[in-house]
Regions:
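Hydrophobic alpha-helical transmembrane segments of multi-pass membrane proteins
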Residues: 46, 74-78, 118-126, 184-191, ...
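Central hydrophobic cores of alpha-helical transmembrane segments in multi-pass inner-membrane proteins
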Residues: 52-54, 76-86, 185-194, 271-272
Length: 334
């Protein structure tokens, strides 16, 4: 009986929740400086969304859905809208740091909160790696185009594997290339974040302006190459075909509007980042919903506009997987 009681006590601790009123009381203590406005929260969400996603997924998306990739982005944005409503309501209801971890703690218990918290840590950590590598590759391409080559030790990473990837003995770290530029980039961003919320928010606003400006430049410049005839075969692969009719493709390549919507959904990840700073915004009940929904709305409009211009300026069968936006503007010799 005593052992059963100990087990039940342990299980009770795992599923124990915290009172929402207690969490609200913590937010009123103002442990962190409340310095962010709705505009700052929207900027944080946009900064997290518009990263490597649109630049790396749209080429593959066009290959899988053709011009109908526009519908895939709309469908992914529509699906994200319901998740955004949940984040907006919960963030306004429990305006303290932690985002999904805090919401899980208040409703599902400690164990679920622990799982969600570490999932978020892994999500933000792992997703930062390809973005940092993309930045490193972009730096290398810019320097190469300017006639300034990087030394061998500073070039992008190259992991050498001999054999099966799941066997630790297959990895040849001695002959692998480490991405120094990506590592330095991550360290600089981490240092910037440690300066304080106001400083990091200001820097994020600058980066967001640069990202949006780059997309707007593409939209305006690409519009000069627009040809409506490129949209005649608008839905070449249907809504959910696994492979094109009568064709053979790689098993890992999704085809159709709905599968591609699931693929490009990666571009929308990040709008929830605004809720992680709930304890640092001036008026969370007002600012969090505006920030989350504003970030998602702006991101959706930019993604769809970019897809329309890309497909209007380039026949969809000619759109490459790598650097499709640069390829689309190549006739302008910018």
């Amino acid at each position: 009986m005593r052992e059963n009681g100990a087990v039940m006590s342990f299980v009770a601790r795992l599923i124990a929740t915290t009172n929402v009123d207690s969490l609200r009381a913590l937010s009123r203590n103002k442990v962190l400086k409340r310095a962010l406005s709705a505009r700052d929260l929207a900027s944080i969400g946009i900064g997290a969304m518009i990263g490597g996603g649109i630049f790396t997924t749209i080429g593959t998306g066009v290959k899988g859905a053709g011009p109908a990739v526009i519908l895939s982005y709309l469908l992914a944005g529509f699906t994200s809208f319901f998740a955004a409503l949940c984040y907006a309501e919960l963030g306004a209801m429990v305006p303290i740091a932690g985002s999904a971890y805090t919401y899980a703690y208040a409703t599902l218990g400690k164990l679920a909160a622990w799982i969600v918290g570490f999932a978020l840590i892994f999500e933000y950590g792992i997703s930062a790696a390809p973005v940092a590598q993309a930045f490193s590759a972009a730096v290398g391409d810019v320097l190469k185009s300017a006639g300034l080559g990087l030394p061998q030790w500073a070039q992008t990473s190259n992991l050498v594997i001999h054999g099966a990837w799941w066997q630790p003995s297959s990895y040849d770290f001695a002959h692998s290339q480490y991405d120094v530029i990506a590592a330095v980039f991550v360290l600089l961003i981490a240092g910037l974040l440690s300066l304080g919320i106001r400083e990091s928010a200001t820097a994020n606003n600058i980066f967001v302006v640069l990202k949006i400006s780059a997309l707007l430049v593409f939209i305006v410049a690409g519009a000069t190459l627009f040809h409506g005839a490129n949209f005649h075969d608008f839905i070449p692969h249907g809504w959910g075909a696994l492979v094109p009719f009568g064709g053979a493709v790689e098993a890992s390549q999704p085809y159709g509007i709905i599968p591609i919507a699931a693929f490009v959904f990666f571009s929308y990840i990040g709008f929830d980042a605004a809720t992680t700073t709930a304890e640092e915004c001036k008026n969370p009940q007002r600012d969090i919903p505006l920030g989350v929904l504003g970030a998602l709305g702006i991101g959706t409009v930019l993604y769809c506009a970019t897809a329309v211009v890309l497909l209007g300026s380039t026949p969809w069968r000619n759109v490459p997987d790598k650097n499709p936006l640069v390829y689309a503007l190549s006739p302008l010799h910018l």
